[in-house]
From Swiss-Prot:
GO biological process: mRNA 5'-splice site recognition; mRNA splicing, via spliceosome
Similarity comment: family membership: Belongs to the DEAD box helicase family. DDX23/PRP28 subfamily.
Enzyme class: hydrolase
EC number of the protein: 3.6.4.13
GO terms assigned for molecular function: ATP binding; ATP hydrolysis activity; first spliceosomal transesterification activity; mRNA binding; RNA helicase activity
Protein name, UniProt field: Pre-mRNA-splicing ATP-dependent RNA helicase prp-28
């Protein structure tokens, strides 16, 4: 044979590469047409039918032959021509002796096992004859192992607890036939060199809430320039200008800023809602203006703002923020605010703006009465309001006069001889002046009722009604929607008088107060600051269960001697005759003390308050007479030597401290006689953020449920009755 016809040896690398390609092609999913699938299905069914027929032909017959008449075991004769016996056997009678049990009976299970072993051995021997010549040694070794196993089973018994586990039976899974769900690199159609995908384009359509960046804006402007050589430059400039204006508008809206960082014109409804929540302002009524955020943003005249700054009012209180804008629109107002919230300035400043627009008092009109009237329940509160009003009215040239009991009518008539724009009075003494023709209200068009609920509690409903009925009716507001229109209510009636404006400030709204408000106020705006009847958060409330006068005096001495509280200090008692007793004991402790109750004359009351305010006296011992409306600066401690008979009086007592944003402490002594108010006391303390309800009060039986019966009242408990208790 020549060298040209000689076969070249196969290339191993080529074979491996070809095999890998075939495997990869087989692993990849391939689409098969429908006709091809039908043909393959028919071929598969034909093969299965052929295989089934072949198996039926090879199935053995009952006589041990197949369909061809041959023996299934390959033996053609009944005689065994195997000349070799591997295992020697004994006589037939003794061959199965070992298989018998103790009673001479054979063990059927062992007999069957040995018979099976012999059949296997004979079958192996017969199969050895049919094996290929190159498998003789392997088969001979296998037969020897079987013979050894048979001998062991015969003479040593069967193997017990032999594991049938075989490691060869474990099949290892290969990844050859595992389906690959990933795309092959050849299937990628987004080729980098494709010009379509060479430069990615940003979509111009955006979903809601998407903000275009400066880079995208410049890119779009550049695309406009390239796409339109003629007018592209101008269009791109207009597009950038439009984007700049939109951005400025968004910055003006800027909902993310806090209301304190925004300008007044940028405030939205959401900002005003947050503002009111921050200051605890709640308003009710139609056409109510927004509160003022600062003094500078109010519509008060510049001259009045300068006076406010000189007085020391840096920031308005919540009631001032809400009430002043409403009052400046000539609206009737009901203010419900906690004690010590700055109500006095809230109604004084709009009052001064109102009367500054009226003609000044002259010799011709000074006898027609004042322009404004302020009513208060107690003499001390009247004098306090008068003092506060003079701070603002005197620089503006207005006169303020107080009319209270305890002074002679001649003295007060002399004070009114030159007329007064503002009169501050108690209802009782003011009715006396009206009945004696010392005063008229012919031109009074501004009325303020401070502590209206307190005036009703003291029995001033009838005097209050007489005073309000004495007001002129020609300038009374209509009870229609026009009363809510600030433009209409700011006009003059018949060219000379303005519409009458009435305001009422109260801590609670009992039915009598509501009836008066409904009768004399027209479509009022209602302003509520915080929760009515609750103590301010600047007062830390403490309660102690101390029964007996002696124990309470001893505990009071311990508190005063602790050095934690500086003067002035106020001690409240329920019965006015106890004032002098407690004051005498306090003086025995080494402290100066004065008393204030209904039996004191007006001169004594004024002297007591003046000595406390001036620092000449350390401690004031008083009944509820001083518990409401009295403003003594820097009171550090209030001691309720006797718990008030109702929770409203308790609230006003402790309101004497913690005023004007300062902190204070209120300590209350409790006894068995106070069970009727323990439930309300627990509730009001639990609502305070700086106070803690003591365990003894929390577990007390009377503090668990609100009492059903009426509250217990002590004789002369309020300090207003008895000799010398007249308010006039």
């Amino acid at each position: 044979m020549s060298t040209t016809s000689r076969r070249e040896p196969p290339d191993l690398a080529a074979l491996l590469r070809k095999k890998k390609e075939e495997e990869a092609a087989a692993a990849k999913p391939r689409f098969i047409p429908k006709k091809e699938r039908e043909r393959l299905e028919a071929e598969k069914k034909a093969k299965e039918e052929e295989e089934r027929k072949r198996k039926e032909e090879a199935k053995p017959q009952p006589n041990g032959t197949n369909h061809n008449g041959n023996r299934m075991d390959g033996i053609q004769s009944h005689h065994n021509h195997n000349p070799q016996r591997n295992i020697p056997t004994g006589p037939k009678a003794m061959r199965y002796d070992d298989d018998r049990g103790p009673n001479g009976m054979s063990n059927g299970r062992d007999y069957r096992d040995n018979r099976d072993n012999r059949d296997n051995r004979d079958r192996n021997q017969r199969g050895a004859k049919r094996g290929a010549p190159n498998d003789d040694e392997e088969k001979r070794a296998k037969m020897e192992r079987n013979d050894e196993a048979e001998l062991r089973a015969r003479y040593m018994g069967p193997v017990v607890n032999q594991s049938t586990f075989s490691a060869k039976k474990k099949r290892r899974r290969t990844a050859a036939n595992k389906f690959n769900f990933d795309w092959d690199a050849d299937d990628d159609t987004s080729r980098p060199f494709d010009p379509i995908y060479a430069e990615r384009q940003e979509p111009l359509v955006r979903l809601g809430g998407y903000e275009m960046t400066e880079e995208m804006v410049m890119r779009k402007a550049e695309a406009i320039r390239r796409g339109d050589p003629e007018t592209g430059e101008e269009r791109a400039r207009q597009y950038l200008e439009q984007h700049r204006r939109i951005k400025e508008m968004e910055q003006r809206k800027n909902l993310g800023k806090h209301w304190s960082e925004k300008k007044l014109e940028d405030m939205k409804e959401r900002d005003w809602r947050i503002f009111k929540e921050n200051f605890g302002i709640a308003t009710k009524g139609g056409a109510i203006p927004n509160p003022m955020r600062s003094w500078e943003e109010s519509t008060l005249p510049r001259r009045l703002l300068d006076i406010v700054k000189n007085v020391g009012y840096d920031e308005p209180t919540p009631i001032q923020r809400a009430a002043i804008p409403i009052a400046l629109q000539a609206r009737d107002l009901i203010g419900v605010a906690v004690t010590g919230s700055g109500k006095t300035a809230a109604f004084l400043l709009p009052l001064l703006v109102y009367i500054s627009e009226l003609p000044p008092l002259t010799e011709y009109n000074k006898n027609d009465g004042p322009y404004a009237l302020i009513l208060a329940p107690t003499r001390e509160l009247v004098q306090q309001i008068e003092s506060e009003a003079k701070k603002f009215a005197t620089p503006l040239g207005f006169t303020v006069v107080s009319i209270v009991g305890g002074h002679s009518l001649e003295e007060q008539a002399f004070a009114l001889r030159n007329g007064a724009e503002i009169i501050v009075a108690t209802p009782g003494r003011l009715v006396d002046c009206l009945e004696r023709r010392l005063l008229v209200f012919s031109q009074c068009c501004y009325t303020i009722m401070d502590e209206a609920d307190r005036m009703i509690d003291q029995g001033f409903e009838e005097p209050l009604t007489k005073i309000l009925d004495a007001m002129p009716v020609t300038n009374e507001k209509p009870d229609t929607d026009d009363a809510e229109n600030p433009q209409l209510m700011s006009r003059y009636v018949d060219g000379k008088d303005r519409y009458r404006q009435t305001m009422m400030y109260t801590a609670t709204m009992p039915p009598i107060v509501e009836r008066i408000a409904k009768k004399y106020l027209r479509r009022p705006a209602i302003v509520t600051i915080g929760n009515a009847g609750e103590a301010v958060d600047t007062v830390e409330q403490r309660v102690e269960f101390v029964s007996g006068e002696d124990k309470r005096k001893k505990r009071l001495q311990e508190i005063l001697n602790s050095g934690q509280f500086k003067p002035p200090i106020i001690v409240f008692v329920n019965i006015k005759r106890n004032c002098d007793m407690v004051a005498r004991d306090i003086k025995g402790m080494g402290y100066s003390a004065v008393t204030l109750h209904g039996s004191k004359t007006q001169e004594q009351r004024e002297a007591a308050l003046a000595s406390l305010r001036n620092g000449q006296t350390d401690i004031l011992v008083a009944t509820d007479l001083a518990g409401r409306g009295i403003d003594v600066p820097d009171v550090s401690l209030v001691v309720n030597f006797n718990m008030a008979t109702n929770i409203e009086s308790y609230t006003h007592r402790i309101g004497r401290t913690g005023r004007a944003g300062k902190s204070g402490v209120a300590i209350t002594f409790l006894g068995p006689e106070d069970n009727d108010v323990l439930y309300d006391l627990r509730q009001i303390i639990s609502k305070s953020s700086i106070s803690k309800v003591p365990d003894e009060l929390r577990r007390h039986e009377a503090a668990q449920n609100k009492p059903q019966k009426g509250q217990k009242k002590l004789e002369e408990s309020n300090g207003y009755s008895g000799k010398g208790g007249s308010w006039n």
